[in-house]
Swiss-Prot record:
It comes from Buchnera aphidicola subsp. Baizongia pistaciae (strain Bp). It catalyses: 5-O-(1-carboxyvinyl)-3-phosphoshikimate = chorismate + phosphate. This reaction introduces a second double bond into the aromatic ring system. FMN binds at R125, S126, S127, N238, A239, G278, K293, P294, T295, S296, S297, R319. Pathway: Metabolic intermediate biosynthesis; chorismate biosynthesis; chorismate from D-erythrose 4-phosphate and phosphoenolpyruvate: step 7/7. The lineage of its organism: Bacteria, Pseudomonadati, Pseudomonadota, Gammaproteobacteria, Enterobacterales. The gene is aroC. This is Chorismate synthase.
Amino acid sequence: MAGNSIGKLFRVTTFGESHGPKLGCIIDGTPPGLEISENDFQKELDRRRPGTSKYTTQRRELDKITILSGIFQGKTTGTSIGLTVKNTDQRSQDYNNIQKLFRPGHADFTYYKKYGIRDPRGGGRSSARETVMRVAAGAIAKKYLYTKYGILIRGYLKQIGNITCKLKSWNEVEKNPFFCPDVKQINNLNLLIKKLKKEGDSIGAKIKIIAEKVPIGLGEPVFDRLDADLAHSLMSINAVKGVEIGDGFAVVNQKGSEHRDEMNKHGFTNNHAGGILGGISNGENIIATIALKPTSSIKKIGKTIDLHGREQKISILGRHDPCVGLRAVPIAEAMMSITIMDHILRHRGQCSKTY
């Protein structure tokens, strides 16, 4: 299976399955001398860790990071960084009833048709459990970008179902299990998730990610545009079905006189472009929004087929998130951090810019 790596100069390769003994990653390209500790990794991993909230999956994992290589006496050495996390709370028996069934809306069918074999336990490699190592790698990128360049990357829940959350306070985002910046919507989100769990159903979500203080010049035309690489990295997250940069699909209803980001001696007067022009960062905040589908792992009985093509009924009994968007914020932050980190190293190499 190819496609397990992302990045050119800052390159991340992940491995492992949902119910395997461990997950891991190799990170190449980290500059030497960056101060980083287990706490830096753990802080990010705990933000996406399952079992920490009654609103998400009740699979309880410690997600304790183990550093194998590339870090000595609290600093990166410039060599490959190896990281692993143990799986400790698998319940593979929950999937006994669907070993020969394809879960509708999941990768079961396509994996089996492509490879002729699949791991039915929690989705195997296609499980969102894989993203724990993206967050671990993202912790390195996030710290490097902030320490060296003052770049701050953070996200929040923008929408679940028909409930919209406005960015009223970044402080509120980390105070609730929804990553919601609007305290007035917390109770509505609470009621919605409780209702979905009772019904055995799920719902989709939107997440917005913002990178502040990104320097001008990141991105390479034509095929290595910064926005194209961001779309690639964000779209690679499980359940993501859409990516918007800046105003995204709203530009369809805009006129050129409205959408263009006019300039004066102080800079841009708007940021409809989301901080990227011609595939290159323009110094404004980089803004991206992702749409995540409702998980198909639900208790509601549905229709499917088995390995022999016979029609069957299916109900998923495993522990699952009623809304995968509730734990997607740190994952999206990590992927944006990894992509910007890669591009800042590429820009430094090509243009000798260190800012």
